[in-house]
Each structure stands twice: as C-alpha cells, then as structure tokens.
C-alpha cells in the first residue's frame, strides 16, 4: 500500500505538466498502471481472475 502522504501529494496539480503520473486506484501503486482501467498489473490480475472486470477473460490460443 502507498503512504497516505504520497497519495495526497499525487492528487495536487503539479507545477509542471510532465510531473503528473498515474497511480492504481485500488492500492496506490505508482508503477505499471493500465490507464484504461486505472489499476496496477497486480490488482488487474486479481480482479480479472475473479471476473469482476467486464469484458476481460483469460486468453487461450
């Protein structure tokens, strides 16, 4: 879990546009966040396996 201070800091508008970054909405992780779902890869995988993300299913070929 991310520190509450880092989550609060990220919500503020940055002084420069390039300083903005994405965080997982579920756990607050700053790395490997899918923009479309606003989830990190770990949370995405957990929710996809449970079937809680509509339209996502395990690939097989």
UniProtKB/Swiss-Prot annotation:
Binds 1 zinc ion per subunit. Its cofactor is Zn(2+). The keyword Zinc applies. The keyword Ribosomal protein applies. GO terms for cellular component: small ribosomal subunit. GO terms for molecular function: rRNA binding; structural constituent of ribosome; zinc ion binding. Keywords: Metal-binding, Ribonucleoprotein, Ribosomal protein, RNA-binding, rRNA-binding, Zinc. GO terms for biological process: translation. Zn(2+) binds at residues 24, 27, 40, 43. Signal peptide: none annotated. Belongs to the universal ribosomal protein uS14 family. Zinc-binding uS14 subfamily. Binds 16S rRNA, required for the assembly of 30S particles and may also be responsible for determining the conformation of the 16S rRNA at the A site. Part of the 30S ribosomal subunit. Contacts proteins S3 and S10. This is Small ribosomal subunit protein uS14. It comes from Anoxybacillus flavithermus (strain DSM 21510 / WK1).
């Amino acid at each position: 879990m991310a520190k509450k201070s880092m989550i609060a800091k990220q919500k503020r508008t940055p002084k420069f546009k390039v300083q903005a970054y994405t965080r997982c909405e579920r756990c607050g992780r700053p790395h490997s966040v899918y923009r479309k779902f606003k989830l990190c890869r770990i949370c995405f995988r957990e929710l996809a396996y449970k079937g809680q993300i509509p339209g996502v299913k395990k690939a097989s070929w």
